[in-house]
Amino acid sequence: MASDFYLRYYVGHKGKFGHEFLEFEFRPDGKLRYANNSNYKNDVMIRKEAYVHKSVMEELKRIIDDSEITKEDDALWPPPDRVGRQELEIVIGDEHISFTTSKIGSLIDVNQSKDPEGLRVFYYLVQDLKCLVFSLIGLHFKIKPI
């Protein structure tokens, strides 16, 4: 697989039910790691690992390239707060980018930020990535990830 590619996404908060989070990563060798921790109603952490085909990795790269996220900067994005935090780290080719921001509830939050255009790119990319990961995990393990 492509050794010039890595992706990690995390969203979570510490609240009434402890540390609740969703995290996934794609490693250069095609390994997908997924973790979903919710203590609501005493749920247990879901951890799954699977290897994806190189065509999935290529599609992932295409999604990232098409989003143009590598042109963005999180300097004006809302910082993590009591509501939660999101982190996105991507290594693609010779670029290594990392973003940190607060949880985004809706496009209203995006539009009211100091950098609505950049945050919108992040918001839609994250939606696409989560959709892809939930589909891969759901199809591979026949579970409902959320």
From Swiss-Prot:
GO terms for cellular component: catalytic step 2 spliceosome; cytoplasm; exon-exon junction complex; nuclear speck. Its main location: nucleus. One of its GO terms (biological process) is mRNA transport. Keywords: Cytoplasm, mRNA processing, mRNA splicing, mRNA transport, Nucleus, RNA-binding, Transport. It holds the Pfam family Mago_nashi. PANTHER family: MAGO HOMOLOG, EXON JUNCTION COMPLEX SUBUNIT-RELATED, PROTEIN MAGO NASHI HOMOLOG. This is Protein mago nashi homolog.
